[in-house]
Amino acid sequence: MAKGLLFIVSAPSGTGKSSLIQALVNTHPLYSIKVSVSHTTRIIRPGECHGKHYYFISNTEFQNMIDKEEFLEYAKVFNNYYGTSKKQINYGLSTGTDVFLDIDWQGARQIRNKLPESKSIFILPPSKEELYRRLCKRGQDSDIIIKKRMNQAVSEMKHYIDYDYLIINDNFNLAVSDLYKIIRVAHLSIKHQIQRNNLLIRNLLNE
């Protein structure tokens, strides 16, 4: 069985990356896709579920996982830790499932260094004004936090150049389509096609 492909998706808070990934999973059943669930030390928000949105753990538990080298990557964001479990990623890929990682640029850099075959995607908002509007519309943060997120967004967006692909989330449906096309192209690479269709290719070339 051919291994699944690993896709890294990063974007500033409020850009819509989580909604894009979920829409991709719901509307494109051609490929088996799983969204990795990260571990975090931040407080659970209303409407979130442990094990679905994140694995919510204590600082002590997180540190124990670091000590045991159980994370593929981890980073501190807004005074909270976020990390990606090695075991979870390896299992998903081994079953032929494509795994999506919704992580920030720091985590993305760590994973690209460890797994250079991964595909990385950065998502930008159409403008700062639209990003601010989306953050306000969520109704989750105070004005002070929103201002902090906007400042952080500018810093994060400077790292788009480190990624393989860039999507502008101006038109949601078009952005979902662009995300799907990236998956399709990755599956058509020579390396992946040889893994998936090795027997077929050998039979065709057998004299």
UniProtKB/Swiss-Prot annotation:
Its main location: cytoplasm. GO terms for cellular component: cytosol. ATP binds at residues 11-18. It catalyses: GMP + ATP = GDP + ADP. Its EC number is 2.7.4.8. It comes from the Bacteria. GO terms for molecular function: ATP binding; guanylate kinase activity. Keywords: ATP-binding, Cytoplasm, Kinase, Nucleotide-binding, Transferase. Residues 4-184 form the Guanylate kinase-like domain. Essential for recycling GMP and indirectly, cGMP. NCBIfam families: guanyl_kin. Belongs to the guanylate kinase family. This is Guanylate kinase. It comes from Buchnera aphidicola subsp. Baizongia pistaciae (strain Bp).
